């Protein structure tokens, strides 16, 4: 955590670490891991809300807990930019981090793979590997998606690659 800003350090240390090393193929152990994931996500969400930093909503979209969908948003120049968020839990989870997808901005930045999967290889994947199995979905959002949004969304907005929903509605009316 050396070289990290104090806010990120503080946030990360308050997200509960997970203990169960289990993936989708591991039956009852996976159910236990999912319980830990939910506890960690709830703690992270509550922490964000209490700090007036609420920026995502996700939930498992299938009973097995292997497909997750939701919304994330980023505020730039006092305008809220909202995006669909989705990801699948890999079979090799937790050894392999989930690939977070923002399909609406697929192809609009070089820091993204096909299908809207955000690039996390350089900074996040080594951190995930070092902290496996203690890191979970909440950690992927905190250390993967949040910094990616902070780095990429302002550039995409300023270059005109993405437009605010109000701007898009106004230009469609004209």
Swiss-Prot record:
A Pfam family reported for this protein in Swiss-Prot or TrEMBL: UFC1
GO molecular function: UFM1 conjugating enzyme activity
Highest taxon in the source lineage: Eukaryota
InterPro entries, per the entry: UBQ-conjugating_enzyme/RWD, Ufc1
Keywords in alphabetical order: Ubl conjugation pathway
Role of this protein: E2-like enzyme which forms an intermediate with UFM1 via a thioester linkage.
PANTHER family xref list: UBIQUITIN-FOLD MODIFIER-CONJUGATING ENZYME 1
Similarity comment: Belongs to the ubiquitin-conjugating enzyme family. UFC1 subfamily.
Name this polypeptide is given: Ubiquitin-fold modifier-conjugating enzyme 1
Species whose genome carries this gene: Arabidopsis thaliana (Mouse-ear cress)
């Amino acid at each position: 955590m050396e070289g990290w800003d104090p806010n990120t350090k503080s946030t990360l240390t308050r997200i509960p670490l997970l203990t169960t090393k289990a993936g989708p193929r591991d039956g009852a152990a996976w159910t236990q891991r999912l319980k830990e994931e939910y506890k960690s996500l709830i703690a992270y969400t509550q922490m964000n809300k209490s700090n007036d930093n609420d920026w995502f909503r996700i939930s498992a979209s299938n009973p097995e807990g292997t497909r997750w969908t939701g919304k994330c948003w980023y505020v730039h120049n006092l305008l809220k930019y909202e995006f669909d968020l989705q990801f699948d839990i890999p079979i090799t989870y937790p050894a392999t981090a989930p690939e977070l997808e923002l399909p609406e901005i697929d192809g609009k930045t070089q820091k993204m793979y096909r299908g809207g999967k955000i690039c996390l290889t350089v900074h996040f994947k080594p951190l995930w590997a070092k902290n496996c199995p203690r890191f979970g979905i909440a950690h992927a959002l905190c250390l993967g998606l949040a910094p990616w949004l902070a780095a990429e969304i302002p550039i995409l907005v300023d270059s005109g690659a993405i437009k605010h929903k109000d701007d898009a509605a106004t230009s469609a009316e004209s």
